[in-house]
Amino acid sequence: NLKRDDAGEFICDCSDISEIIAISKDGHYKISKITEKSFFFTDLIYVGVFDRGDTRTVYNAIYKDGKTGVNFAKRFSITSVTKDKEYDITMGTPGSAILWLTANHNGEAESVKIRFKQQKKLKKLIDEYDFSTLAIKGRTSRGNIVSKHTIQSIQLKSLGVSTISGK
């Protein structure tokens, strides 16, 4: 069993030979073998069992670049990685943060409602973003620009259907 902390919050079932993926709020992720005790980043936003040959699991993310403050959206799959090496979902600049992340095991693409922080001359405070308009790329892709304005919150509007054809 995979647990988040000493209190024993159950996350998911796994075996002794499984590998896990841990993603932090600042955009770093690491894939590691299951051990009795493993230490990962602070501020974890996703922990799950990682399957190396899985091409159907698609991650949908919206992140803020730390250097420019521009918000990007991307859909990506993680297929080949080196164990215990740190990778980055964002562009890797200091101050970058993941604002929205979902792991969809069948390639689903959801729609989200984005609320922007109120600023002068900003007329549209609420916008919608549909992940099905994005192509599934590699983890190193930058993504598409969502907005240059500061995002206050993101909420799930609707779950989407799978964008990957059947086997």
Describe each PLM feature range:
Residues 1-167:
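C-terminal interaction appendages of subunits in large macromolecular complexes
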